[in-house]
């Protein structure tokens, strides 16, 4: 009788343990984000100056302990990067390139900068989590953080100025469906329109004032020059 009671207790414990362990894992690793369309996740529009805060708000909810960030959330952040990049090429560059130089083009450029801030915030958050989970992404994290800080500064430099948002048909649950090929010719044309717009409106600060990001100062050494070259090459890449 005593043996039967002990056996029953052991069976009960064995049955409960997997359930408790499973519940514990779910509570620690449950995904934070759900699928979003580009138009749902975008922070572009309104006025420039708060892109940093807006991006962090859109992407809030990850655990403070980044080792516990769920794989599905890393996939989501990567997908945000992808669809924002696609919108940058397929929507913003295309529209800016087709716009007559002037304030309208600059308003589009400000929205493009806001989009870059969201894209790069998602990228940096994902890399920070990957680093916390043991992946060697230090160099990439430093590179993307530098680009993020630059675009945040560009956005803040245009604080209070109108930003014209564009819609784009893409979703984080299937970013490949909206894939847009990189187009250097289109990107250059859009950049030329922004340059001409700055001159036409009398805006100061050159390309950097509109967030084009072209470096005008000579790099201090070859390593810095290489980083600058990489930034120029991947500005419109994932």
For each predicted feature, which ranges?
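Fungal secretory targeting signals
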Residues: 1-22, 120, 238
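Composition-driven recognition of long, low-complexity, acid-poor segments enriched in small hydrophobic
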Residues: 23-26, 220-224
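Long, low-complexity, intrinsically disordered segments
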Residues: 222-238
């Amino acid at each position: 009788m005593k043996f039967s009671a002990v056996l029953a207790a052991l069976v009960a414990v064995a049955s409960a343990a997997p359930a408790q362990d499973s519940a514990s894992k779910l509570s620690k690793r449950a995904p934070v984000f759900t699928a979003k369309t580009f138009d749902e996740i975008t922070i572009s529009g309104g006025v420039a100056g708060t892109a940093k805060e807006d991006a962090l708000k859109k992407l809030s909810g990850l655990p403070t302990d980044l080792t516990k960030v769920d794989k599905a959330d890393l996939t989501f952040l990567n997908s945000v990067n992808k669809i924002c990049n696609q919108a940058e090429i397929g929507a913003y560059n295309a529209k800016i390139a087709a716009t007559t130089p002037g304030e309208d083009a600059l308003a589009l450029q400000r929205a493009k900068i806001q989009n870059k801030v969201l894209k790069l915030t998602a990228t940096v958050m994902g890399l920070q989590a990957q680093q916390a989970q043991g992946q060697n992404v230090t160099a990439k994290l430093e590179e993307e953080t530098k680009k993020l800080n630059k675009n945040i500064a560009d956005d803040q430099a245009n604080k209070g100025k109108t930003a014209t948002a564009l819609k784009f048909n893409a979703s984080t649950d299937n970013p490949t469906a909206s894939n847009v090929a990189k187009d250097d010719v289109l990107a250059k044309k859009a950049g030329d329109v922004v340059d001409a717009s700055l001159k036409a409106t009398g805006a100061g600060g050159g390309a950097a004032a509109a967030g084009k990001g072209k470096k005008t100062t000579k790099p201090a050494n070859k390593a810095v020059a290489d980083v600058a070259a990489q930034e120029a090459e991947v500005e419109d890449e994932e």
